[in-house]
């Protein structure tokens, strides 16, 4: 039996036998593969002949596969005919007839396909009709160290090709129709780096025996690696280069349960971005679910940007529109006509003064003279309505208000700043308020600290302090500090006499520092009567706003 010298007895393909269907030769002749399809056939058939000698040994499962030599793609058809006879004599499949079928491992392929013998003819006939994936091997076969290598399919999982019994829209998982580059090993046998994608391909362990081939002819959009196939064992998976396989046959059919498995078990993070084209039919099957999650921006993220852009566009459009003035009324027409005369007669240059003069003259006019300007104003409105039919006075009013607010905002800020500065830089002798003023401010803002209880002694120091106007703009803190400073600085007999009336343990804390209103209410009963005694003194003095001393 002819054999190939394929690198020291190493195998190139699967170590199992194949059953050749009658329609394979016809399909191969009809396929547009030209010479590369024949090269694939020669490669696999020669490997089948070569592996028949080493079929009894299990040690070849650990043998490292090397790239196929170039000559294997150019062998004559004699080896093909011999391989066909070899396949027809066999009882079961030894492997896929084409190297273009990548092997994908499915860990839980059911139990009744695992006996150590060939399938019955009835089961084989059933396999020709449907893809028997879902009844597949238990994980016990995966744990066996003596189980065949990934290149050995002997009596484990049936590999069925049925090119004539399938719908063109039922592809499962395929790769682009490109041939292996010379010297590049198959993706499922090599631990090297994929020359097309640059992604390292780690070798999968030898104990993962059950796997099944998938057609490479239909779906190029599901890339590798397929880490979802062995989630239970947590073992590393091999990857299949998307440009590494070529097959003339269309895709194999897949039932609904397998499609749900593919759609649910793909892990998006294991798959690189696709760089491929769709099937020749252009319509992917619903079972093919792209593993890459499409990231579409949410409407919440887009709406603020769109709203801001729309606002900017609207503002720009408003700015581009010319400012349409409202039609002049009778008085405005009179002012427009008489302003030049008034300016020539008067030496005043202020616009306000000129407007006042024009207003007086307008009211001094008779009804007949004013009626002339009213008629002019009516004509002006008619002409304006013809020129600008969609114009409304509200447009100008809104714009003017916005402009005024924008212009006034910095001025108001400067005004408030200067006002605060003036309040803070008052001299200490002038910033002291009258006792009534401090008491009134305390009533206005009871929660703020004030020197209302300390004011009975301090304000009575001088007569000029009582004549100060009521100041409501000064801060309570500044007022309290001024009261305490004035009390310490004053040495008049009236202040000493007032302080003498108060008890010594109570008067000193009250007069030494400002006390908030809440603290005076929550103070002990010994302090509260003294505060009540001080209040009549506050109320007895008159409330003077602009009074001056009579001296």
Swiss-Prot record:
The lineage of its organism: Eukaryota, Metazoa, Chordata, Craniata, Vertebrata. The keyword Transcription regulation applies. One of its GO terms (cellular component) is beta-catenin-TCF complex. Residues 1-77, 183-213, 391-474, 492-515 are annotated as: Disordered. Residues 17-32, 52-77, 407-416 have a biased composition (Basic and acidic residues). Residues 324-392 bind DNA. Its main location: nucleus. Pfam families: CTNNB1_binding, HMG_box. The gene is tcf7l1-b. Residues 465-474 have a biased composition (Polar residues). Phosphorylated. Phosphorylation by csnk1e promotes binding to ctnnb1-A while phosphorylation by gsk3b may reverse this effect. It comes from the Eukaryota. Residues 1-11 have a biased composition (Gly residues). Disulfide bonds: none annotated. One of its GO terms (biological process) is regulation of transcription by RNA polymerase II. Residues 445-464 have a biased composition (Low complexity). One of its GO terms (molecular function) is DNA-binding transcription factor activity, RNA polymerase II-specific. Residues 1-61 are annotated as: Interaction with CTNNB1-A. Keywords: Activator, Developmental protein, DNA-binding, Nucleus, Phosphoprotein, Repressor, Transcription, Transcription regulation, Wnt signaling pathway. Participates in the Wnt signaling pathway. Binds to DNA and acts as a repressor in the absence of ctnnb1-A and possibly ctnnb1-B, and as an activator in the presence of these proteins. Required early in development for the establishment of the dorsal body axis in response to maternal Wnt signaling. This is Transcription factor 7-like 1-B. Interacts with csnk1e, ctnnb1-A, ctbp-B, dact1-A and gsk3b. May interact with ase and tle4-A. Interacts with tle1-B. Belongs to the TCF/LEF family. It is found in: Nucleus.
